[in-house]
């Protein structure tokens, strides 16, 4: 059998060179159980025309279910959503160097996240630390980056700890989903625009936990604030407005979006909550929300509905958190676990986990409505769409 090195060399030789107007886009996947995926895939996307090339295997990885790029360096980070590694409990985050001519990835370092099932990863705006949310473990990890963007080991004890375990305190509480909310389940982690706070959506706790972040020491402090949402909401992902003063949380279990505004405290104040589905959808059995994003121009919000297989479209009303529901657009992809808005804000790409496809939509800059472009490519079990970040974002 050919070696992994030989396979990587062959992939580079077969990879088309990135042309003007094209940007690489990576797709995180599930490799187990029983999928055809071998890791992270890359395609070339034309930000002017919306054309998407056939994907290639960019880097072998196990369950790279979420990806995040460095704000300055050609580095991509992926969680390995697993319960343990090499006989040790806890998942892994892996650092890959990007070949800027092709988008092919080379593994550079990998470290434990200290908890089972990491499902989300992010990099702070200055590119000094990587943070991961451990869904199975109900915890958050902060790992320091070297000057080259490689990962340093997680420190879990003492004053320099970069690890926080969420605590369970909901026994007997009415209104919660006993199957999904049996313990803490950290589902995403985001850094405030200033880089001093970390927001973790915990689906099991129905809270957004706010931790202080020391990027110099790569440490997290215990909970500084806790934003409580409705019982049974199941907060999953957070999208922060470009102004840094507003945010919206997509709630997986009750299929809603909650508006949040900044407060004098480190966290947010809760404003109104609205549905991601039209009122005529009364039977929501088997349906759930997944991803949320604010358009880079700051005028629209989008959220994905699994089972209904649609994207909810909203217009942001003025300088408030109020959302005007514009309707839903079919994703033409089954189980839209994730989507991302392409650089320039003209197109949106949807990952259909169950259909093994990625579909492309054009965004109307005036109304925010989506239009299917007709472009769809095959990617095995896609669950994340990632572009390179702009510096400082």
Where are these regions (language model features)?
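Asp-box/WD-like beta-propeller blade repeats and closely related beta-sheet repeat scaffolds
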Residues: 103-187
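Short loop/turn segments immediately following beta-strands, especially the blade-tip
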Residues: 44-50, 96-103, 143-154, 212-219, ...
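A short beta-strand motif characteristic of beta-propeller blades
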Residues: 53-59, 106-111, 173-179, 222-228, ...
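Short glycine/acidic-enriched loop and turn motifs that connect beta-strands
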Residues: 31-35, 82-86, 136-139, 205-207, ...
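Beta-rich, blade/repeat-based domains predominating
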Residues: 34-37, 61-71, 114-125, 166-196, ...
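Blade-level signature of beta-propeller repeat domains, shared across WD40, Kelch, NHL, RCC1
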Residues: 353-359, 371-393
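Blade-loop segments of beta-propeller domains
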Residues: 53-123, 127
């Amino acid at each position: 059998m050919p070696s992994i090195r030989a396979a990587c060399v062959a992939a580079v030789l077969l990879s088309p060179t990135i042309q003007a107007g094209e940007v690489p886009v990576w797709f995180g996947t599930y490799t187990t159980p029983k999928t055809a995926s071998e890791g992270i895939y890359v395609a070339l996307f034309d930000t002017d025309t919306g054309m998407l090339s056939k994907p290639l295997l960019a880097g072998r990885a196990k369950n790279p279910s979420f990806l995040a790029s460095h704000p300055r360096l050609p580095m991509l980070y992926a969680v390995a959503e697993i319960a343990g590694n090499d006989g040790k409990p806890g998942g892994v985050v892996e650092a890959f160097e990007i070949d800027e001519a092709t988008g092919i990835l080379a593994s550079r370092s990998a470290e434990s996240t200290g908890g089972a099932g990491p499902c989300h990863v992010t990099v702070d705006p200055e590119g000094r630390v990587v943070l991961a949310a451990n869904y199975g473990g109900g915890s958050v990890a902060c790992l320091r980056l070297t000057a080259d963007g490689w990962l340093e080991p997680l420190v879990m004890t003492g004053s320099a700890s970069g690890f926080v375990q969420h605590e369970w305190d909901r026994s007997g509480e009415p209104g919660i989903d006993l199957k999904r909310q049996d313990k803490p389940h950290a589902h995403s982690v985001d850094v405030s625009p200033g880089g001093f706070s970390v927001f973790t959506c915990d689906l099991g706790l129905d809270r957004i936990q706010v931790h202080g972040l020391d990027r110099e020491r790569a440490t997290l402090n215990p909970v500084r604030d806790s934003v409580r949402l409705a019982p049974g909401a199941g907060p999953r992902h957070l999208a922060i407005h470009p102004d840094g003063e507003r945010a919206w949380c997509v709630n997986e279990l009750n299929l809603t979006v909650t508006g949040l505004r900044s407060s004098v405290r480190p966290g947010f104040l809760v404003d109104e909550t609205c549905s991601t589905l039209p009122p005529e959808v009364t039977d929501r059995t088997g349906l759930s929300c997944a991803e949320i994003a604010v358009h880079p121009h700051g005028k629209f919000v989008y959220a994905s509905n699994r089972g209904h297989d649609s994207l909810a479209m909203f217009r942001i009303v003025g300088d408030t958190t109020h959302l005007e529901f514009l309707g839903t657009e079919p994703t033409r992809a089954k189980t839209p676990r994730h989507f991302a808005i392409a650089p320039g804000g003209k197109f949106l790409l949807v990952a259909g986990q169950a259909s093994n496809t990625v579909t492309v939509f054009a965004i109307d800059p005036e109304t925010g409505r989506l239009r299917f472009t007709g472009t769809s490519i095959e990617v095995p079990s896609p669950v994340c769409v990632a572009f390179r970040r702009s510096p400082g974002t």
